[in-house]
Regions:
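Structural helix-adjacent loops and short alpha-helical linkers that scaffold large soluble proteins
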Residues: 29-42, 72-84
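Beta/coil-rich, acidic/histidine-enriched accessory regions frequently appended to metallopeptidases
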Residues: 59-135
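Acidic/His/Gly-enriched intrinsically disordered linker/tail segments
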Residues: 1-35, 42, 46-58
């Protein structure tokens, strides 16, 4: 992938090519299928619909970190390395013009809290390199 092999890691939401931006989300689906969780996204989205969101507008970035935690919880897998490889844990201020214009600030605290949450679950790492999965 152009994103994974880029000389400098880019924040996933700032990847210009929408198809490259979607790859990690599809790889999570492929991984879920491989471990036998066929209804992963259906269950995840149902859960999200029934929970209060973590922010709107520029604060909606908090929903992405909730998504990361829930992926790990639903799959009972520590996917920290996967999300890190794809640039989900890049800190800084980012302008994203995708379905609207947003100015996100991703702080080290947000990343630390997400990683700490995942580590506290003691989930195993995936038995395969999820960044290499393709259909």
């Amino acid at each position: 992938s152009k994103v994974l092999n880029a000389p400098e890691k880019q924040f996933i939401m700032c990847v210009k090519d929408p198809f490259h931006k979607l790859i990690p989300f599809w790889q999570i689906q492929i991984y879920a299928d491989k471990i036998g969780y066929k209804d992963f996204y259906a269950d995840l989205m149902e859960h999200l619909r029934n929970q209060p969101h973590k922010g709107a507008g520029n604060a909606s970035i908090h929903n992405m970190y909730e998504y990361i935690k829930l992926c790990c919880d639903f799959l009972k897998t520590d996917l920290t390395d996967f999300f890190d490889a794809w640039g989900f844990f890049q800190t800084g201020k980012f302008h994203v013009g995708d379905y609207g214009n947003y100015d996100f600030e991703v702080t080290p605290k947000m990343i630390e809290e997400t990683k700490h949450y995942i580590a506290s679950k003691n989930y195993p790492k995936p038995s395969m390199d999820v960044t290499k999965l393709a259909d």
